[in-house]
């Protein structure tokens, strides 16, 4: 969840919205208690203030508004500055820091969740100090903390920082912090405790061990809990507690099961009680059958151990008819691939992916896939019906779908001195051609490409009449081919007859005359560099 340290002027409308949002946040924060917290006494004062606040709320609970609840939560979070940061981090065993910027929309989204997490941690007796710092106002301090973008979450343990790797809901923040600073599991002994737990936790993994300390599987369950940073692990020795948490429970023996809020709410684990196997089960089942991509869960989705990900880009209304069929498809290919829904009207999420396929103007449903192990992408080019999507997934799971390479439409090159090559014609024009091919690889945003293109035009005129030499160019931003791997632009490649697999890279800093000399030398032609065209 990182954004650049400065807003992008290209998105002026979005920036105006962010400024308005930042102003509203500033107004909300203006009522916060200013806390220096430079010493234990200052933190004690904060605790006393919160205690008074809680007493007042108990006396008038019906008058407590949502704004007051948020205000209270925000007061629990200490504001760091240039004077108190070092003292607080060095003086506390655990400090969770949120680095934010007033103009950052994602910071604005995260701050109330962070404050809510701080409230929950306080209520369960956590010793973690929750703090935030305006990284733009205190840029030097933020830099010293190694805050490089916004928002950034860091946990300091005895003054040493570690990056945050959890989710971005308040519940996920609490789970991650607890696992890093306290017990990796929660023990529930009574039905009342379980009822209270269910009010705050919606996704968790349950372990039933009749005699927790003596169970052979208990240690493995606890070990699995420490290996996972996202899901809350709950253990109990009470059958009644277990049945309240997992109504589908069918055994009184050792049991492990996952509870979620989505379809497949209750999933039993039937493998051996080994930490690695439990985590593997969790990774295969913790996401919904069809995951909706949001800005807050992108990191979790991209880091999923299921690396073959099928993405359905669709408008909300159009997706409704696909939702149930997609869940059925997901069940068939669970652990082999992951199905993800992206609202095609959300440009921030959809556009980067659609651009990779050269279909950024798409308005109707698009089904695509990425294999992050093979670094390859795929596109369903037929109608995105449920049956076609299932066939597409079957082919992906069995490795029978060809990778997709984007291409512009095939151009009309009649009478062109420099032939335009696209992804679909690269084989025909460049690789399978019996002629030598000098290929200019460019992009629209390349600064030096225009000057080089003029040189290539001159060279094409200079060698006009040489039937065994073709001059060509390809826009690498809109066309791809597995045999075309270029890292910088512009690039000039000479594909010699009989040696097409190993093209010669020419210096783009050479003059047209020098290039002509090199071409003559490589093709063993009589030097033509003295002709007037150069």
From Swiss-Prot:
It is an enzyme of class 5 (isomerase). Residues 56-182, 407-524 form the Thioredoxin domain. Pfam families: Thioredoxin, Thioredoxin_6. GO terms for molecular function: protein disulfide isomerase activity. GO terms for cellular component: cytosol; endoplasmic reticulum; endoplasmic reticulum lumen. Widely expressed. Keywords: Disulfide bond, Endoplasmic reticulum, Glycoprotein, Isomerase, Redox-active center, Repeat, Signal. SUPFAM superfamilies: Thioredoxin-like (SSF52833). Residues 1-30 form the signal peptide. A motif (Prevents secretion from ER) lies at residues 531-534. Its EC number is 5.3.4.1. The active site is at residues 104, 446, 449. Glycans are attached at residues 158, 415. It comes from the Eukaryota. It is found in: Endoplasmic reticulum lumen. It catalyses: Catalyzes the rearrangement of -S-S- bonds in proteins. Disulfide bonds join 446-449. Belongs to the protein disulfide isomerase family. PANTHER family: PROTEIN DISULFIDE ISOMERASE, PROTEIN DISULFIDE ISOMERASE-LIKE 1-5-RELATED. Acts as a protein-folding catalyst that interacts with nascent polypeptides to catalyze the formation, isomerization, and reduction or oxidation of disulfide bonds. This is Protein disulfide isomerase-like 1-6.
């Amino acid at each position: 969840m990182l954004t650049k340290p400065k807003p992008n002027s290209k998105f002026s409308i979005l920036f105006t919205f962010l400024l308005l949002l930042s102003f509203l946040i500033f107004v909300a924060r203006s009522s916060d208690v200013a806390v220096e917290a430079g010493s234990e006494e200052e933190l004690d004062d904060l605790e006393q203030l919160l205690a008074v606040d809680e007493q007042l709320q108990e006396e008038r609970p019906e008058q407590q508004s949502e704004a007051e609840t948020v205000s209270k939560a925000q007061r629990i979070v200490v504001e760091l500055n240039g004077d108190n940061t070092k003292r607080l981090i060095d003086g506390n065993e655990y400090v969770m820091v949120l680095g934010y910027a007033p103009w950052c929309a994602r910071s604005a989204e995260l701050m109330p969740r962070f404050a809510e997490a701080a409230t929950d941690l306080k209520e369960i007796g956590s010793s973690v100090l929750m703090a935030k710092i305006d990284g733009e106002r205190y840029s030097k301090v933020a830099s010293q903390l190694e805050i490089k973008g916004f928002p950034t979450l860091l946990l300091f343990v005895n003054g040493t920082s570690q990056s945050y790797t959890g989710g971005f809901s308040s519940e996920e923040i609490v789970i991650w912090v607890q696992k890093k600073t306290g017990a990796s599991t929660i023990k529930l002994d009574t039905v009342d405790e379980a009822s209270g737990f269910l009010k705050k936790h919606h996704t968790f993994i349950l372990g039933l061990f009749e005699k927790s300390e003596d169970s052979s599987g208990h240690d493995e369950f606890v070990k699995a809990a420490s290996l996972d940073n996202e899901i809350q692990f709950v253990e109990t020795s009470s059958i009644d507690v277990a049945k309240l948490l997992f109504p589908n429970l069918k055994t009184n023996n050792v049991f492990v099961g996952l509870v979620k809020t989505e379809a497949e709410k209750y999933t039993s684990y039937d493998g051996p009680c080994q930490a690695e196997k439990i985590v593997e089960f969790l990774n295969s089942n913790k996401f919904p059958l069809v995951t909706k991509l949001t800005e807050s869960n992108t990191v979790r989705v991209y880091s999923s151990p299921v690396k073959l990900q099928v993405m359905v880009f669709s408008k909300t209304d159009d997706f409704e008819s696909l939702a149930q069929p997609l869940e059925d498809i997901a069940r068939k290919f669970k652990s082999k691939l992951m199905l993800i829904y992206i609202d095609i009207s959300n440009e921030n999420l959809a556009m980067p992916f659609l651009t990779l396929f050269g279909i950024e103007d798409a308005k109707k449903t698009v089904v695509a896939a990425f294999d992050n192990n093979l670094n390859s992408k795929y596109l369903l080019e037929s109608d995105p019906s449920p049956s076609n999507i299932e066939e597409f997934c079957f082919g992906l799971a069995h490795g029978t779908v060809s990778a997709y390479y984007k291409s512009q439409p095939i151009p009309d090159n009649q009478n062109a001195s420099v032939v335009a090559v696209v992804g679909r014609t690269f084989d025909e024009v460049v690789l399978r051609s019996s002629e030598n091919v000098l290929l200019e690889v460019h992009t629209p945003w390349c600064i030096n490409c225009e000057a080089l293109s003029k040189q290539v035009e001159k060279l094409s005129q200079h060698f006009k009449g040489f039937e065994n030499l073709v001059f060509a160019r390809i826009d690498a931003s809109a066309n791809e081919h597995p045999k075309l791997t270029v890292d910088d632009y512009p690039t000039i490649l000479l594909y010699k007859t009989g040696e097409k697999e190993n093209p010669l890279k020419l210096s783009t800093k050479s003059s047209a005359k020098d290039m002509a000399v090199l071409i003559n030398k490589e093709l063993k032609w009589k030097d033509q560099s003295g002709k007037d065209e150069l």
